[in-house]
Amino acid sequence: MAERMRPIRARRVGFERERGVLSLEADTGRSFVSAELPGPDAGVSEALRVLSPLAESQLPLQFLRACPDCLSFVVAQSDLPQVREVLDRAGVSFEASEGCAVITVVAPNMRSIPGLMARMGEVLFGRAIGVYQMADSHSSVSCVIAAG
C-alpha cells in the first residue's frame, strides 16, 4: 500500500535573498559580426541566407541577435576567416570587428536589481569602452565589448 504523500510547502531560504557577484568572466579572442538584411520586409528567407551556411559549416555563434535589417553574432576570432569565407560565398554584406571580449557578471537574483544594465553601460561608456551588445538573464549580465 502506497504511503500518503504530504504536500511540500514552499518557503524562502536565506540564499534566495542574498545578492552579490559570484563571478566575473572574461572571454577574450572574440569577433563581433553584423550581417545586413535587405530591410524590415525581408522575411525569414533572408535571415536563413545568413544563418544556414554558417550552420552547415558548423560554426558556433554566440549572442545571436535578429533585427529587421541585420543579424549580429559573436564568434571565436580564430573562426573569423571561415565566417568571412562562408558569408562572402553566400553573397552576404557584413562587417566584422576583431579584438572583442564577452564579459559576464554572475550574481543571484540579478533580475530584481533595477537599473543594473544601465549602470553597467554608464561604467563602460564612461571609460570610452565600445559596447557592441548587452544581454541579461535571471542571474547574469553579459556584454560584448571592444577589448583592444
Task: Identify the meaning behind each predicted range.
Residues M1-G148:
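A conserved regulatory-domain signal marking ACT and ACT-like small-molecule sensing domains
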